[in-house]
Amino acid sequence: MDADPHVSELFDPTAWRAVDGFGDLTDITYHRAQGQGAVRIAFDRPEVRNAFRPHTVDELYRALDHARMTPDVGCVLLTGNGPSPRDGGWAFCSGGDQRVRGRDGYRYADGVDPAGAGRLHVLEVQRLIRFMPKVVIAVVPGWAAGGGHSLHVVCDLTLASREHARFKQTDADVASFDGGFGSAYLARQVGQKRAREIFFLGRAYDADEAHAMGAVNASVPHADLERVSLQWAAEINAKSPTARRMLKFAFNAADDGFVGQQLFAGEATRLAYMTDEAAEGRDAFLEKRAPDWSRFPHYF
């Protein structure tokens, strides 16, 4: 069976099925893995190196949020379709489409409600990736530049094409800057000096160089990239869902302030609700009696 030309050369149609209810997508594709709880969300504008416009971000957020709320999905693969029909180049995402950038952000097409114009809501996507209780893997087949570079940074893991992946922070070249996860969290990954080099010099790094500095988990032969990403997803999904969720929030907590504390503590509260002790507290309240805590030890 030939790969769907509207997906990607690396896409194996026997391994995936389209997610129901998303047939109207134009700028991304959204598929569910056959036989495991993983989804593939891909930028689908290869002719412009998978640059995003506001409509792209709307679709991306919608698919990611659907994956977040799907109870049997544990892993999200975020990638870019390709290659470009124009020149054969590959891209994960090259950031915001500068052709639609205005003074107040990135502009919707003509005819869209002006109240929605001038957006920088890819930052909302960053927060969704950061805070969703699922493991998000950036699968980078080509260029990850500018805002696309920041998206790979905020993902939990990154796999990259050894032959074609290129990492380049172009923000300062176009008078932009990611003052949040794209820079500060990058410094956590590669160190302050290296992160400043990446932003201030704007050089391109291949997969092996990015792996050596700690920004990439594995440099993978291009032809094997999606197969390996599915294997990683399968290994992740073989672990405890509760442990994975708590681990992600624990890793994030030190950098995320009170928001990180709330997310971790909220999950801990939900775990506490599952205990007999919590059931006793609830039942005593509903039965208008004093709770009997005598069965529950004071652990140390």
What are the residue ranges of the model-derived segments?
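Conserved CoA-thioester-binding segment of acyl-CoA-metabolizing enzymes
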Residues: 1-83
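C-terminal long alpha-helix characteristic of the crotonase
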Residues: 87, 160-165, 216-263, 276, ...
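Well-ordered beta-strand positions
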Residues: 157, 197, 201-203, 209, ...
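CoA-thioester-processing core
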Residues: 124-131, 139, 145-199, 213, ...
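Glycine- (often His-adjacent) and acidic-residue-rich active-site loop
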Residues: 48, 80-125, 175
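Structural motif
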Residues: 116, 139-140
